[in-house]
């Protein structure tokens, strides 16, 4: 099964006042918590869609299947982020999980359970 993930990392940070995904929490950028929680071994591709160069640079530090994707519509909101991610999926993707980038408490085990349920449903 060719499973993809799209990490939505395009927030404007208006209420926060800056790019909150690069803000540090206990010495680690917020987005790293989300990326580190993704069970990369279960995905064929993990696309991180963003408008921020510093996030693209950070994602470049991660091995495959992580890939940074620059959005062509940075002001288009969440729906534009989703469209950009879907447009960049491999054509043989069997399914896609959408993940918000600003969830530092997300646990790898909960994502593994979600994927297992999805795979069980397909059988």
Q: PLM ranges: what are they?
A:
Residues 1-50:
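N-terminal glycine-rich phosphate-binding loop and ensuing alpha1 helix
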Residues 11-13, 53, 74, 101-104:
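Short glycine-rich anion-binding loops that position phosphate/pyrophosphate groups of nucleotides
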Residues 17-20, 25-29, 72-80, 105, ...:
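Residues at secondary-structure transition points
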Residues 20-22, 60-64, 83-84, 111-115:
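Short, glycine/charged-enriched secondary-structure capping and boundary segments
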Residues 32-95:
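Conserved N-terminal catalytic core of the sugar/cofactor nucleotidyltransferase
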Residues 76-123:
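Conserved beta-loop-beta/alpha segment of the NTase-like Rossmann-fold superfamily
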